[in-house]
Regions:
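Short, charge-rich amphipathic alpha-helical segments embedded
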Residues: 29-47
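Structural signature of tandem alpha-helical TPR/SEL1-like repeats
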Residues: 3-5, 10, 16-29, 50-63, ...
Length: 139
């Protein structure tokens, strides 16, 4: 049986090749032996997000932030998944955590401003675009 580092590398490689189902299975296998690893949870969330499974992605990013409350990228990624679920208020809370941890994060600041602007438009027009996340997920 390969060691954890080898399995992690294999999972990451499969994800980069777009073999998401294989990457997902490998990250899930890793969690069976190391369920308190925030990096694995974050990577699992990225795979789920890329598969369009936003609710599951939010849960995985939440596990990452529960395991490591200072994992800025997991907070940021969670916000993007929440946006896709139309949960802008929760997305703002996650972004605020990321920004508090890294106040110089221009991308998080920009994403926050975009959400606030979209929320203002919704209050003006009554319409929403739940797929407004313009940023890339972070490993």
């Amino acid at each position: 049986m390969p060691d954890t580092r080898d399995l992690f590398s294999e999972a990451t490689e499969r994800a980069e090749l777009g073999r998401l189902d294989e990457a997902l299975a490998l990250f899930q296998a890793l969690l069976k032996t190391d369920s308190n690893n925030a990096t694995i949870w974050n990577n699992l969330g990225i795979i789920l997000f890329r598969q369009g499974k936003y609710r599951d992605a939010v849960n995985a990013f939440g596990q990452a932030t529960d395991t490591d409350p200072e994992f800025t990228n997991a907070w940021y990624n969670k916000s993007l998944a929440l946006i896709h679920l139309g949960k802008e208020t929760e997305a703002l809370r996650a972004l605020d955590k990321a920004i508090k941890l890294n106040p110089r994060d221009a991308e998080a600041q920009s994403q926050r401003a975009l959400i606030v602007r979209k929320m203002a438009q919704v209050s003006d027009t009554g319409k929403t675009d739940s797929h407004s996340a313009q940023s890339q997920l972070r490993v």
